[in-house]
Structures are given as structure tokens and as C-alpha cells.
Amino acid sequence: MSLSRLLIKDFRNIENADLALSPGFNFLVGANGSGKTSVLEAIYTLGHGRAFRSLQIGRVIRHEQEAFVLHGRLQGEERETSIGLTKDKQGDSKVRIDGTDGHKVAELAHLMPMQLITPEGFTLLNGGPKYRRAFLDWGCFHNEAGFFTAWSNLKRLLKQRNAALRQVSRYEQLRPWDKELIPLAEQISTWRAEYSSAIAQDMADTCQQFLPEFSLTFSFQRGWEKETDYADVLERSFERDRILTYTAHGPHKADFRIRADGAPVEDTLSRGQLKLLMCALRLAQGEFLTRESGRRCLYLIDDFASELDDARRGLLASRLKATQSQVFVSAISAEHVLDMSDKNSKMFSVEKGKITD
């Protein structure tokens, strides 16, 4: 599916916008602070229920307004789907799909698989493990129908178990939680391991094209010792967990490590190389989804020109075109994206929250 129309109301510095979009490349050009990133963020929020630059809802809603409203029209090969999201200052959300209320944000995420490439996205490579878990979980969510429910239940059980650790004195008192937690943890870890194995070749091939000077390796770490039953780990770690008042081992501690020539990429690669690697990983993940399910991602790319020279921008542009996906690109100057444009592209000018084509 592609987003054929986007309506934005009271989001960031955008009062009202109604955009007719290209199913191919859409360029957002404007000075820093003009609102071009806000358009990308509106699309991302419509598909995720939250913004990517701030978790504080008050910063996302336009000044002195009570709520933002986002509406989109998704065009598929056989049908059109209408989607909407409203969120107020209290954080209450309303999701509407095809004119009916009561839907979940996860349904929007399923309808709009998207890949985000921003200057802040370096956290995938040099941030904590939670960012790389999120990378794997995106793939599991779109590959495994039961993943989201299992993941939600895991979060709930871990929260309850951690609260119980403050009150219990013997491991036997935790067994009711662990009886539910253990099979969930093992299932989620299995899904993550299978996904990381399945996508490994795609990542290796794409990374080789973007960074041929490095030998890159990927390894999934499930969050507890290899060849050890999670039940044994939980029981053996009880006293330490009780002192810490949290569960120290499990899928919530998993990681997906990436090395270049045997060393952590964050210690080896320059910022430009890290951006190329981030782009390669996002592309590989999107292309894997298309091959496995026939569904195409939306790609959101903020500040396209930063950190990349002309040759590398050209490589990224050609790979994005090859996906035949819908792509949204922000840039300070139209010169940075003109070589990516064709007769099906749309160029939007953004100035002080006003968007024109």
C-alpha cells in the first residue's frame, strides 16, 4: 500500500495541511525549522501512535491546541483504506479505520510498515540494546501473527514479577509468574533468533554493497546463557534479582550485535559509514518483508544529504528506487534530491509550517 493522501491538523508547527502524494518519491524541501521533518513525523505517528522526536505529547500538539488529528488514505492494488489518529494532551488516542472507531495502534502499524532513517537513528548502532531489540521486533511483528500479543504479555508479566520481587522471600512465591513467563520468553526468543537468521544474508549482501571495505558479522544474543533453560536461570538468579528488584535475565535483555572486521561498529566506523550501515539495514529489512509477504514499506528519510557524499547519496537513491516503494525525503535544498526525481515524483516546499507543491 502507498499513502495517497495525508491530512495534518495541529501537529507540531503545522496548523492544517492536505497533501496529495506520489506512490513513488515525495520530496520535502525547506530550511531548518520549516516543518519538513514534522511532515515525516506525522506520517510516522499515523503508523505508530507516537512521534519519533519526543515522547511528550504536549510537544507534538501545536501550541495552545488540545489535540492533533492525522488522517490518511492508503491505496492498495485492490482497495483503498481510510485511517485516522487523534491524540489529546492527556495522551488519550482514538484510532479510526474505514470510518469505524475502537481500533488499536497495532492495526495501523500492520497496515503501514515503514522504515525510518533520521540523524537520530544512529542509536540503532551506537545506542543501547533496546534499539536493536526494536529492530528485530519490527521484523517479528510483521512476520509472526502472534508476536505482538506475546510481546505485550511478556511486558506485563515482567512488570508484575519485578513488583513481586520487592515482596517475596522465597523463589516458590514467584512460580505463578514464572509459569507464564517462561514459555513466552522462549517463544519470543525463538522468533527473534529465526528472524535474525532469515534476514542475515539480506543484510550481509546489502551491507557489502554499501560498505565493501568492511567484513560485517551479525549475532543474536537472547538475553541469557546459551544452552541453558530459562527456568533454571530464573531460579538460580532469584537472590540477585530480589536484591536488584528486577529480572536481570531474559528476552528483555536480548541484543543483536553488529561487528566490522571483528570490532563493534560503533568503535570502527565513521559517522558517514554508520549512516550507510543504518540505511543498508533498513533497506534489507524492508526488502525482506516485501519478498516474504508481498507488502512494501514506506521509507521516511530525514535530512537526506547529511553525512553522505554525492556517490553514496546516489547509491542510496538507486537502491530506494529499486524497491518500488513509496519514499518520503526531506532536504534543505532541492539540489540535493533533483537527481532522484522523475516524472512520478512530487516536490513539496515547506516554510513555517505551510506546505505547497
Curated annotation (Swiss-Prot):
One GO cellular component, as annotated: cytoplasm
InterPro entries: DNA-binding_RecF, DNA-binding_RecF_CS, P-loop_NTPase, RecF/RecN/SMC_N, RecF_2
Location relative to the cell: Cytoplasm
Pfam family, one: SMC_N
Chief place of localization: cytoplasm
Superkingdom as given in the UniProt entry: Bacteria
Record: residues binding ATP: 30-37
Gene Ontology MF, one: ATP binding
Entry annotated with the keyword Ribosomal protein: no
DNA damage as UniProt keyword: yes
Any single GO BP term: DNA replication
Alphabetical UniProt keywords: ATP-binding, Cytoplasm, DNA damage, DNA repair, DNA replication, DNA-binding, Nucleotide-binding, SOS response
Family: Belongs to the RecF family.
HAMAP family per the UniProt record, alphabetical: RecF (MF_00365)
Function: The RecF protein is involved in DNA metabolism; it is required for DNA replication and normal SOS inducibility. RecF binds preferentially to single-stranded, linear DNA. It also seems to bind ATP.
Protein name according to UniProt: DNA replication and repair protein RecF
Lineage: Bacteria, Pseudomonadati, Pseudomonadota, Gammaproteobacteria, Enterobacterales
